[in-house]
């Protein structure tokens, strides 16, 4: 019984560095209706880079 229009869906954040590294988190659709962009640590290249929401 998956909730298709859940208020807090699970999303994947994918590294923009092209390493393929991902973070999995939840977001609130009411507060952040646009795609999420966060600066997080990518251990494959040992740097902080932007991670973008992947749908």
Curated annotation (Swiss-Prot):
InterPro entries: Ribosomal_bL33, Ribosomal_bL33_CS, Ribosomal_bL33_sf, Ribosomal_zn-bd. GO terms for biological process: translation. GO terms for molecular function: structural constituent of ribosome. The keyword Cell inner membrane does not apply. Pfam families: Ribosomal_L33. One of its GO terms (cellular component) is cytosolic large ribosomal subunit. It comes from the Bacteria. SUPFAM superfamilies: Zn-binding ribosomal proteins. The keyword Ribosomal protein applies. Keywords: Ribonucleoprotein, Ribosomal protein. PANTHER family: 54S RIBOSOMAL PROTEIN L39, MITOCHONDRIAL (PTHR15238), LARGE RIBOSOMAL SUBUNIT PROTEIN BL33M (PTHR15238:SF1). Belongs to the bacterial ribosomal protein bL33 family. NCBIfam families: PRK00595.1 (NF001860), rpmG_bact (TIGR01023). This is Large ribosomal subunit protein bL33. It comes from Paenarthrobacter aurescens (strain TC1). The gene is rpmG.
